[in-house]
């Protein structure tokens, strides 16, 4: 299977945009602070072989994307910040679970870690950007692509 890199990024972003909960969806890691509201950014974090799913003539690849949801942590009401982010993350996981081949562009979103390095997970944290502090939740979304690299002696 050839790597449809743009197709994969487009499908990940399309799901985020279709939810109607983000004020903006970027397909890159932002260099500047976003505007107000809830933001989503998508970029590649890691690429490695999925040995347990590979054969003797080709290697299945695992491409892990960061899908980061973030919002200004100084907004009011403060008690709504984490629940709003959690709702966004839950909606994204549901969307990726419901279309785990991303429209046939990949073998599957590795929800449960069948590729050998753990499945989809979320990590919360904070980010200081342009002297503003953001609360964030980052989804680590591993994508499996069959026969990505040929093997030869």
PLM features: residue spans?
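Charged, amphipathic alpha-helical segments and their flanking helix caps
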Residues: 1-34, 46-153
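Two-metal-ion RNase H-like nuclease active-site motif
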Residues: 42
